Amino acid sequence: MRINPTTSDSTVSTLEEKNLGRIAQIIGPVLDVVFPPGKMPNIYNALVVKGRDTVGQQINVTCEVQQLLGNNRVRAVAMSATDGLTRGMEVIDTGAALSVPVGGATLGRIFNVLGEPVDNLGPVDTRTTSPIHRSAPAFIQLDTKLSIFETGIKVVDLLAPYRRGGKIGLFGGAGVGKTVLIMELINNIAKAHGGVSVFGGVGERTREGNDLYMEMKESGVINEKNIAESKVALVYGQMNEPPGARMRVGLTALTMAEYFRDVNEQDVLLFIDNIFRFVQAGSEVSALLGRMPSAVGYQPTLSTEMGSLQERITSTKEGSITSIQAVYVPADDLTDPAPATTFAHLDATTVLSRGLAAKGIYPAVDPLDSTSTMLQPRIVGEEHYETAQRVKQTLQRYKELQDIIAILGLDELSEEDRLTVARARKIERFLSQPFFVAEVFTGSPGKYVGLAETIRGFQLILSGELDGLPEQAFYLVGNIDEATAKAMNLEGEKK
């Protein structure tokens, strides 16, 4: 469904038209509000409570209607803390769903779930807003052609390619390079696709959000001197926020991304960190609303809620939203309903390995664990598919031989296996790559490697043409020509 942004100045109607109710009950982040007969607000309408608490502090709490209880009562979930609210306080029905600012003015800024800037850089310079609740695009509007989304990152493009308008799960523990990979993708989509990115921080640590913002400023993804030239908008609803805010912040980020896709007709990257927290917040809200819990205590509406978010992330004939979602797996149990429901929507998985990070191979993407539904000959072509399969076979054989090497040493292997190991070690190093956003830390200039160059490089390694080059020459280079040039430099240094 195409976006219809509004350009009104205020979400609250004029005084004469105000629909006023009063708080009847407060249960933590849940409010029951009584309205006059015949003036009930609709489900998902935004309600605003304005007033002063007992010590005279100004209160401004926005809530969202979740249930109509009968007897002129509605139950609403607050988007911020309900401290200081009392029974009998006046509640204004805005007559519409929560609306957030959209468009180019959002780039380089940090927002909360309500679309209010929280970066102390003043108000957002836009009057265009859009409601966070919307149905998914109609099937007739979808672009059903399967096409690869080129990232310029060798290991991703070759072994687990992303689908344009697809959904990718990003799995990785702390300190293996998730943030740097996310920033590189934001940088590359801006350079190669002329696209923008939206980052939705859903229920994660405030410190991580702050670190990401600082690193983005340091690497130039957010341009401090000219905010308008930034490549990303940030939307945060962190761990300390009420469940209502954490449940809706993903929709706020998605709404901003939809505007870039539908109105600006751009390719958009939408990052959600972490999709599990979206489910977790929904579970809390479900319990607060008194719904009967389902399997493992999750909400009975788990699949519906996940589907309503994921179905809006897609390619239309105007543009695309490609989503990269960090997935936390509780207790490493992949059968838990939250990750299991998420997997049903994913087109590709990018798994980051601590073992590779420890070896200093960055990006630390595990070439054997990462998967993609796009890696089929009819989609990527025979040449790409064959090269990817041969790379995986070589790495798999190397993995099988590692125990023998550890116990007996390389000399005990057959000639063929020794050759396989040598090529696998070159491939492993050639899968590393210097990043643009890491230039400030490493001093090495970043490299964007096109898909054709990537395939050519790995074909040359597999064919044995480069067997004579030292494996160090393949470490942290862009295309294969840089590896051969580096090998010549290493030879020169030895002499």
UniProtKB/Swiss-Prot annotation:
Q: What is its EC number?
A: 7.1.2.2
| A Pfam short name | ATP-synt_ab_N
Q: Which reaction does it catalyse?
A: ATP + H2O + 4 H(+)(in) = ADP + phosphate + 5 H(+)(out)
Query: Top EC class per UniProt?
Result: translocase
What keywords are annotated for this sequence in UniProt? ATP synthesis, ATP-binding, CF(1), Chloroplast, Hydrogen ion transport, Ion transport, Membrane, Nucleotide-binding, Plastid, Thylakoid, Translocase, Transport
Q: Which InterPro entries does the entry link to?
A: AAA+_ATPase, ATP-synt_VA_C, ATP_synth_F1_bsu, ATPase_a/bsu_AS, ATPase_alpha/beta_chains, ATPase_F1/V1/A1_a/bsu_N, ATPase_F1/V1/A1_a/bsu_N_sf, ATPase_F1/V1/A1_a/bsu_nucl-bd
**Which compartments is it annotated to reside in?**
Plastid, Chloroplast thylakoid membrane
User: Which GO molecular function, any one, fits this protein according to its record?
Assistant: ATP hydrolysis activity
Location, primary (coarse class): plastid
Q: Which GO terms describe its biological process?
A: proton motive force-driven mitochondrial ATP synthesis
Quote a single Gene Ontology cellular component term: chloroplast thylakoid membrane
**Positions annotated to bind ATP:** 172-179
Membrane topology annotation: Peripheral membrane protein
Cite the Gene3D superfamilies for this sequence: 2.40.10.170, Bovine Mitochondrial F1-atpase, Atp Synthase Beta Chain, Chain D, domain 3, P-loop containing nucleotide triphosphate hydrolases
For this protein, the record's SUPFAM superfamilies field holds: C-terminal domain of alpha and beta subunits of F1 ATP synthase, N-terminal domain of alpha and beta subunits of F1 ATP synthase, P-loop containing nucleoside triphosphate hydrolases
Which domain of life does the protein's organism represent? Eukaryota
Spell out the family assignment given in the record's similarity comment. Belongs to the ATPase alpha/beta chains family.
Quote the function comment for this protein.
Produces ATP from ADP in the presence of a proton gradient across the membrane. The catalytic sites are hosted primarily by the beta subunits.
> What assembly does the database describe for this protein?
F-type ATPases have 2 components, CF(1) - the catalytic core - and CF(0) - the membrane proton channel. CF(1) has five subunits: alpha(3), beta(3), gamma(1), delta(1), epsilon(1). CF(0) has four main subunits: a(1), b(1), b'(1) and c(9-12).
Name of the featured protein: ATP synthase subunit beta, chloroplastic
Source organism per entry reads: Scilla messeniaca
Biological classification of the source: Eukaryota, Viridiplantae, Streptophyta, Embryophyta, Tracheophyta
